[in-house]
């Protein structure tokens, strides 16, 4: 199997960052710059996405989780802090289910425990249908705009454009299938790790009920809400986001 792209910067206790749908390693650039000053930051690009666009994509959240755990095994990383954004939040929940004792602290960012994502701006199946009807170019410009309050006028929107340059329709559809078929709600009670949940109150991908479900069911969790932010809080309120995460993991 072709190796995926993994950026690995800084020294210290590892922080693993897992991007979401149509994301990339580069989309964590502001976090890499900040956190690499005091910890080792590992940011894979998921198979088929971003810098790993030439790798064969997966249609299973569990397989994505296993792939990242495999990367960490190769790097001989035993314990780590773990953050996942959106679909990446599903992946980190699955990683914690498989290897929870290795996760020091968990950060579930703009995510939920139900892959179908109740309350999303459209159903996963609708996105799949539009993807097939409209193709990648239209879909890849339509969906990421919804992740920012300012849409494609946000200063960091270019990261979304970069991320999708070489992503195929099959990869995009496989990830939608993976999300649609995944659920982690029954496992939330088994997550004992200290957990930070982050959400922007204008997020149209995940509504409050989704993050509240995480908060109510994960025993050692706390929820932090960013006002007037959408789905990409880490790109909309970079400094506040980074400080919040730093205070949590240190």
Task: For each feature predicted by the language model, list its residue ranges.
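Active-site loop/oxyanion-hole signature of alpha/beta-hydrolase fold enzymes
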Residues: 32-33, 42-83, 98, 243
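Gly/Ala-rich beta-loop-alpha elbow adjacent to hydrolase catalytic centers
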Residues: 84-88, 92
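Conserved alpha/beta-hydrolase catalytic His-Asp/Glu region
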Residues: 116-122, 133-189
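Short beta-strand/loop motif that positions the catalytic acidic residue
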Residues: 191, 197-199
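Acidic catalytic loop of the alpha/beta-hydrolase fold
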Residues: 202-206
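Catalytic histidine-centered segment of alpha/beta-hydrolase-like enzymes
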Residues: 229-238, 242
